[in-house]
């Protein structure tokens, strides 16, 4: 018993020592990391909403400023912050000299650059970056009234999506064919005088479907139960469809249709001639199009390069202003565009985003600061702090109506009525076959034939040539064909 107790105490002490050792190792690692970072760092940034903005007292606030504060708490360093002197992010000229924040890092005028600075291969050759603290891409910023500019000649088709229109046309054709088949199969539809053919010809069936869609009664009127089932189901389908169309069309006219831009992608920019489009001069966005092997992106760059004096802007704010005041589309960082869209309800960003990239904190090449900063950024990401800062600075101030917008009716919205129509058509066809089988059995008893033989004869006569149809009309009594089926 004493040995067992001593063994238990020994294991407990070893476990405690292991835990303490692990905690001490983590503490030592943090202390070692802090010792690698100078007590005071010089940080450069750029005035870019919402990353860094001046308050009324000329102090700086924004996402980048809050991120810097979180890093100082985590790594225990002080900093002096200044705005980049030339107001640029950083690009290399023909002589190999760097401008902007990248240039300040290289010239050791700053230890860190915390801003929406895109991580690119060219910059990575000159400076070092941490892991991205935010992901972004290239978006298209548009003014709503120009974004939604489209052909109003066919605007009446907009309440329904293309897929729904295709479904309606297919349903109309199938219903007309079913009505035509029922008119041929059902004996009750062959009660006309011998001089007339069956009333539900293919043309009449198509016309009847159109009449129901426009809520206008159309001749001929169905007499057989099977034909009436199909007619009733089609009328229910038509009324539901028209109600949905009228409601969607009213919403389309009265709502802000600019929420669904006609410019969806960079390809759409090339296909139109009403909007100029450009980006920041000497920016990573411009270099992306310049260095891309994609033919479409090359055409985008050629367009901007030929008109660079007219379409390239010096600052992001200038690009936003041009979008709001003229027919201009601005290509730039999607994350910054999302911010201005959240604050200016007359702007919208096109759905497509290309050239995914990230924002990172920059330091001099092979700087020992990169690793501890990267670890701190990952810890902030895992704790949800970065997402909190994102929600804080990208808060949408537009009304709910501005955010919701209008969208066309999709097939899944009316899926139930399509299902009911399909069931009704199947039921109508089944009933018409039952009507014909009843008539065939009656003829078989009168003519002393087998039911199968009489049924085959009826089918052949109904889908034969005109002379066979006339023979059927003369052969079938005009007064009691439906009565026989009902009996």
From Swiss-Prot:
Protein origin, superkingdom: Eukaryota
Stored InterPro entries: Glu/Gly-bd, Iono_Glu_rcpt_met, Ionotropic_Glu_rcpt, Iontro_rcpt_C
CC terms in the record's Gene Ontology section: postsynaptic membrane
Biased composition (Polar residues): 477-487
Membrane topology: Multi-pass membrane protein
Predominant subcellular localization, coarse grouping: membrane
Residues glycosylated per entry: 78, 97, 282
Localization per Swiss-Prot or TrEMBL: Cell membrane; Postsynaptic cell membrane
Residue ranges annotated as Extracellular topological domain: 18-162, 250-413
Positions on the Cytoplasmic side per record topology: 184-228, 435-487
Alphabetized UniProt keyword annotations: Cell membrane, Glycoprotein, Ion channel, Ion transport, Ligand-gated ion channel, Membrane, Postsynaptic cell membrane, Receptor, Signal, Synapse, Transmembrane, Transmembrane helix, Transport
Signal peptide start and end residues: 1-17
Pfam families: Lig_chan (PF00060), Lig_chan-Glu_bd (PF10613)
Transmembrane segments: 163-183, 229-249, 414-434
PANTHER family, per the entry: IONOTROPIC GLUTAMATE RECEPTOR (PTHR18966)
Protein's UniProt name: Probable glutamate receptor
Taxon lineage: Eukaryota, Metazoa, Chordata, Craniata, Vertebrata
């Amino acid at each position: 018993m004493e040995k067992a107790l001593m063994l238990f105490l020994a294991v407990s002490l070893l476990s405690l020592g292991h835990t303490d050792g692990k905690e001490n190792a983590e503490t030592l690692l943090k202390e070692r990391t802090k010792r690698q970072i100078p007590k005071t760092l010089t940080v450069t940034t750029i005035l870019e909403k919402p990353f860094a903005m001046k308050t009324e007292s000329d102090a700086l606030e924004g996402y980048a400023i809050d991120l810097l504060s979180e890093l100082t708490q985590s790594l225990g360093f002080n900093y002096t912050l200044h705005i980049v002197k030339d107001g640029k992010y950083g690009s290399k000229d023909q002589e190999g000299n760097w401008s902007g924040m990248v240039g300040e890092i290289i010239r050791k005028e700053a230890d860190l650059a915390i801003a929406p600075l895109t991580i690119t291969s060219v910059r990575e050759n000159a400076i070092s970056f941490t892991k991205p603290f935010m992901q972004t891409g290239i978006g298209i910023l548009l003014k709503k009234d120009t974004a939604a500019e489209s052909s109003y000649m066919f605007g009446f088709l907009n309440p329904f999506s293309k897929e729904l229109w295709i479904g309606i046309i297919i349903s109309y054709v199938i219903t007309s064919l079913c009505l035509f088949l029922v008119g041929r199969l059902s004996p009750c539809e062959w009660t006309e005088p011998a001089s007339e053919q069956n009333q539900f010809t293919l043309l009449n069936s198509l016309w009847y479907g159109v009449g129901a869609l426009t809520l206008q009664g159309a001749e001929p009127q169905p007499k057989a139960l099977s034909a009436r089932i199909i007619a009733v189901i089609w009328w229910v389908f038509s009324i539901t469809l028209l109600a949905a169309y009228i409601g969607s069309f009213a919403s389309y006219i009265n709502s802000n249709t600019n929420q669904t831009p006609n410019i969806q992608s960079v390809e759409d920019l090339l296909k139109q001639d009403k909007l100029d489009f450009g980006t920041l001069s000497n920016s990573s966005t411009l270099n992306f199009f310049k260095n891309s092997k994609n033919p479409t992106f090359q055409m985008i760059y050629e367009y901007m390069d030929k008109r660079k004096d007219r379409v390239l802007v010096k600052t992001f704010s200038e690009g936003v202003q041009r979008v709001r005041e003229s027919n201009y589309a601005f290509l730039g960082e999607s994350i910054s565009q999302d911010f201005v869209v959240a604050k200016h309800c007359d702007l919208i960003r096109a759905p497509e985003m290309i050239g995914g990239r990230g924002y990172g904190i920059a330091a001099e090449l092979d700087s020992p600061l990169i690793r501890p900063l990267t670890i701190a950024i990952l810890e902030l990401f895992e704790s949800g702090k970065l997402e909190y800062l994102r929600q804080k600075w990208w808060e949408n101030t537009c009304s709910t109506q501005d955010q919701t917008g209008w969208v066309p009716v999709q097939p899944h919205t009316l899926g139930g009525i399509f299902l009911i129509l399909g069931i009704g058509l199947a039921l109508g066809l089944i009933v018409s076959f039952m009507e014909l089988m009843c008539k065939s059995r009656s003829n078989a008893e009168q003519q002393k034939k087998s039911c199968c033989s009489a049924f085959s004869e009826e089918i052949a006569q109904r889908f034969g040539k005109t002379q066979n149809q006339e023979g059927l009309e003369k052969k079938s009594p005009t007064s009691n064909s439906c009565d026989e089926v009902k009996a």
